[in-house]
């Protein structure tokens, strides 16, 4: 797939002309189309429709949309300008576009905090605009810098872990959803760690006795962010990967971990899965983590393999015990802005539920035999009128998480009581 660097730029903000565009991720990987965001209402719709997604990216788009809207206020006469109270109402409205992702609420609440020095009846002025502009720019710049730190810290954790395990040879990493440049200001969180690790631990340049051989992104039903977006980024970076369905995880890990009878998926793809790295939309005080639906399932599978040294495999003649890899680290990667210390446990996280048609239909372009892209079609795949449960996220209990990697050099791990200490 030929591409350019701007293809992976999910958010384009013109700092001089105060214009915001976002990459319409519903059209990827077949079309690269940017859409303008000219108001808070535009941002609400784009976030709700998932034209932009990923907790950090949502927060940045939300903040920049406020800048654009306030900039537009300043072009009006004083008598037509909105008040601080009007703006606060708009911020509350925008927060509801994606209630599970704490980054958006944090960013907009920060802006509301800036507004507290003004009276509700004050009209929007240049001073207010400048404060919001400075905040949004800092949010973007800090996110990009922090993502690179997350990548570096995750790489160090991986090297230390494999060294302590005395592991040698090739290994693989599994991930879910999309946590790369398309979900952030750039580089990414979980996918950022994968990028940094592959850059440092390729077979030909690794200074260690191990190297990153392969990535397994999960398809991530029902919205298919893994299939559409993560594969798009990995392909662009030329990082070796194989796409799998969400229900292939256990079988794949078992196949790659069978030291006595490894069955390669393809040539050179026999390295065991040593890490499952995921992003986060909200991490609460005890470490429980809300992330894309299917994340809890991955942590449960990793826990099973870590606690079962042998799996019974039935052959035609007898039953044999197969030794399996029992050291899969489950890593959550996210900026510290994703940590919500006001929520104690995952039971208190509000989980967004998506429309039923996202599960009962598939949407995509028609492809001819040559691979050329045609019109966008919606295809039914389920019995019409059936009951559907479609949560966008699930909550992974902290007990199933090995580490939380942020921009802080100190990687959060659990104490002797099995508890995280995330107090900043």
Curated annotation (Swiss-Prot):
It catalyses: 5-(methylsulfanyl)-alpha-D-ribose 1-phosphate = 5-(methylsulfanyl)-D-ribulose 1-phosphate. Keywords: Amino-acid biosynthesis, Cytoplasm, Isomerase, Methionine biosynthesis, Nucleus. The active site is at residue 281. Its EC number is 5.3.1.23. Pathway: Amino-acid biosynthesis; L-methionine biosynthesis via salvage pathway; L-methionine from S-methyl-5-thio-alpha-D-ribose 1-phosphate: step 1/6. It comes from the Eukaryota. One of its GO terms (biological process) is L-methionine salvage from methylthioadenosine. One of its GO terms (cellular component) is cytoplasm. Its main location: cytoplasm. The record marks 177 as: Transition state stabilizer. It is an enzyme of class 5 (isomerase). GO terms for molecular function: S-methyl-5-thioribose-1-phosphate isomerase activity. Pfam families: IF-2B (PF01008). It is found in: Cytoplasm; Nucleus. The keyword Isomerase applies. InterPro entries: IF-2B-related, IF-M1Pi, IF_2B-like_C, Initiation_fac_2B_a/b/d, M1Pi_N, NagB/RpiA_transferase-like. HAMAP family: Salvage_MtnA. Belongs to the eIF-2B alpha/beta/delta subunits family. MtnA subfamily. Catalyzes the interconversion of methylthioribose-1-phosphate (MTR-1-P) into methylthioribulose-1-phosphate (MTRu-1-P). This is Methylthioribose-1-phosphate isomerase. It comes from Candida dubliniensis (strain CD36 / ATCC MYA-646 / CBS 7987 / NCPF 3949 / NRRL Y-17841) (Yeast).
């Amino acid at each position: 797939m030929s591409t350019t660097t701007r293809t992976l730029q999910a958010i384009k903000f013109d700092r001089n002309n105060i214009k915001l565009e976002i990459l319409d991720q519903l059209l990827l990987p077949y079309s690269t189309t940017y859409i303008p965001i000219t108001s808070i209402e535009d941002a609400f719709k784009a976030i709700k429709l998932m034209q932009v997604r990923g907790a950090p990216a949502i927060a940045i788009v939300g903040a920049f949309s406020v800048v654009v809207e306030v900039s537009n206020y300043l072009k009006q006469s004083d008598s037509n300008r909105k008040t601080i109270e009007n703006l606060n109402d708009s911020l509350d409205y925008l927060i509801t576009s994606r209630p599970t992702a704490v980054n958006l609420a944090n960013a907009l609440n920060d802006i509301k905090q800036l507004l507290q020095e003004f009276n509700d009846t004050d009209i929007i002025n240049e001073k207010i605009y400048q404060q919001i502009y400075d905040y949004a720019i800092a949010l973007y710049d800090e996110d990009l810098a922090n993502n690179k730190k997350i990548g570096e810290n995750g790489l160090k954790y991986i090297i230390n872990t494999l060294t302590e395990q005395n592991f040698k040879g090739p290994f693989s990493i599994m991930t879910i959803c999309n946590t790369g440049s398309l979900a952030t200001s750039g580089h990414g969180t979980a996918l950022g760690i994968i990028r940094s690790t592959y850059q440092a631990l390729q077979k030909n340049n690794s200074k260690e006795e191990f190297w990153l051989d392969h990535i397994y992104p999960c398809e991530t039903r029902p919205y298919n962010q893994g299939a559409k977006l993560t594969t798009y980024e990995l392909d662009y970076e030329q990082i070796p990967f194989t796409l799998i369905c969400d229900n292939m995880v256990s079988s794949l890990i078992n196949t790659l971990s069978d030291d006595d009878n490894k069955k390669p998926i393809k040539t050179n793809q026999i390295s065991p899965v040593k890490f499952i790295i995921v992003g986060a939309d909200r991490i609460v005080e005890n470490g429980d983590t809300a992330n894309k639906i299917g994340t809890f399932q991955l942590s449960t599978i990793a826990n099973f393999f870590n606690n079962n040294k042998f799996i019974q495999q039935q052959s035609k003649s007898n039953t044999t015990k197969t030794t399996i890899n029992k050291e899969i680290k489950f890593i959550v990667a996210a900026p510290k802005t994703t940590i919500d210390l006001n929520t104690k446990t995952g039971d208190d996280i509000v989980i967004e539920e998506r429309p039923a048609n996202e599960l009962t239909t598939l949407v995509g372009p028609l492809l001819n035999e040559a691979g050329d892209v045609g019109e966008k079609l919606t295809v039914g795949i389920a019995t019409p009128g059936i009951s559907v449960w479609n949560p966008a996220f699930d909550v992974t209990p902290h007990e199933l998480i090995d580490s939380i990697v942020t921009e802080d050099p100190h990687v959060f791990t659990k104490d002797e009581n099995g508890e995280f200490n995330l107090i900043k």
